[in-house]
Swiss-Prot record:
NCBIfam families: bioF, gly_Cac_T_rel, PRK06939.1
Subunit structure and binding partners: Homodimer.
Signal peptide start and end residues: none
CDD domains: KBL_like
Highest taxon in the source lineage: Bacteria
Catalysed reaction equations from the record: 6-carboxyhexanoyl-[ACP] + L-alanine + H(+) = (8S)-8-amino-7-oxononanoate + holo-[ACP] + CO2
Molecular function GO labels: 8-amino-7-oxononanoate synthase activity; glycine C-acetyltransferase activity; pyridoxal phosphate binding
Protein known as: 8-amino-7-oxononanoate synthase
Pathway: Cofactor biosynthesis; biotin biosynthesis
Enzyme Commission number(s): 2.3.1.47
Length: 392
């Protein structure tokens, strides 16, 4: 049988450069601490912002759903895979996001792909922030629309593109709400102002803002008091919500169209009952326990202040994403490995996830972290950084 020698060669190069990674196997519930390699470590790499992955109400809802409805649905949504709970979840999401309707996909990644590839044609143009998530980039690649990229959060450049693109049928501005690698928030008020001035649509990917920003975690649109002025809101059910999946919220016309045209929706089996019911319960928890979001922000502010005090260069974050900039990729991964060995799970992030020379340790703070855990992590981070001459 023919071998994949060309792939093996590339893997060997990655190993020589110190950028080859192995998957970390966790053997516990996802929480502020996890079991990794039979060792308890402080978790600083999870997107479990509010600690909902192991919330008793979500776990109870999932268990009861399995007992009543089974392990799976056995079909796609458009044939025999739509249960009452799927429709109920989508109505809850629409109400939560203050839109007319919503549609759930298998992941946030496929949501962006499904939306972008469905609603744009060769007569249209999509205008994207240069630091948008990979799922947006891949979704744009699936369209036949023209593409323009503006410099990160550069509103002058965005306006120039809008002025030069008046002849297109549809112009769609796409942006992350919170940028996942740097933790900064999109200037959405200005984006919406420009969109309204130049008759363009706006799409926001709120993966890292849902459950984090806005009233009860409603996201970036609500954070900027722009409810009703953003055409497409994409979110995940796998980060702050704590379960699995993605969704799009918007007008009834948009959602009805996507039900007929979005290929990831049309050709994927629907969410199993346990996942669906847990997602439903998570929305209720967001409404019932706003103190979780308050604690999240308190912990994030505390950790950020301490990290800067240690002397780290921190990306211009405005959220619980705290990127400690290292630069060199191999050094970043050595640092990450040293931290894990000392009991701090803080994953190194490097090219192609971020630009070359922009490698970093990305810490994500959660509502579950105690001050004692954060202080312990900070002590270990400082000690290992000094050993590697990252800090003086």
């Amino acid at each position: 049988m023919k071998e994949f020698t060309y792939l093996q060669d590339e893997l060997e190069t990655m190993k020589q450069q110190g950028t080859h990674q192995t998957l970390k196997e966790i053997d516990s519930k996802q929480s502020s601490t996890v079991t990794l390699n039979e060792q308890s470590v402080i978790q600083l790499s999870s997107n479990n912002y509010l600690g909902l992955t192991s919330h008793p109400r979500l776990m109870k809802a999932a268990k009861e759903a399995i007992d009543e409805f089974g392990a799976g649905t056995g079909s796609v949504r458009t044939i025999a895979g739509t249960m009452t709970m799927h429709e109920r979840l989508e109505k809850k999401l629409a109400a939560f996001k203050k839109t007319e309707a919503a549609l759930v996909f298998q992941s946030g990644f496929t949501t962006n792909q499904g939306v972008l590839s469905s609603i744009l044609t060769k007569d249209d143009i999509v205008i994207s922030d240069e630091l948008n998530h990979a799922s947006i980039i891949d979704g744009i690649r699936l369209t036949k629309a023209d593409k323009k990229v503006y410099g990160h959060a550069n509103m002058e450049e965005l306006e120039k593109i809008l002025k030069k693109s008046m002849n297109y049928r549809v112009r769609l501005i796409v942006t992350d709400g919170v940028f996942s690698m740097d933790g900064d928030i999109a200037p959405l008020s200005e984006i919406v102002r420009l969109a309204e001035a130049y008759d363009a649509f706006v799409m926001v990917d709120d993966a890292h803002a849902s459950g984090v920003l806005g009233e009860n975690g409603r996201g970036t649109v609500n954070h900027f008091k722009l409810d009703g002025r953003v055409h497409i809101q994409v979110g995940t059910l796998s980060k702050a919500v704590g379960v699995l999946g993605g969704y799009v919220a918007g007008s009834a016309v948009l959602i009805d169209y996507l039900k007929h045209k979005a290929r990831p929706f049309l050709f994927s089996t629907s969410h199993p009952p346990a996942v669906t019911r847990a997602c439903e319960e998570a929305i209720e928890v967001l409404l019932d326990e706003p103190e979780r979001i308050e604690t999240l922000w308190e912990n994030a502010a505390y950790f950020k202040e301490k990290v800067i005090g240690l002397g780290f260069e921190v990306a211009p974050t405005e959220t619980p994403i705290i990127p400690m900039m290292i630069g060199d990729e191999a050094l970043t991964f050595r640092f990450s490995k040293a931290l894990i060995e000392r009991g701090v799970f803080a994953q190194g992030i490097a090219f192609p996830t971020v630009a070359k020379g922009k490698a970093r340790i990305r810490a994500i703070i959660t509502a579950e972290h105690t001050k004692e855990e954060l202080d312990r992590a900070l002590t270990i981070i400082e000690e290992e950084a000094k050993k590697l001459n990252i800090l003086d």
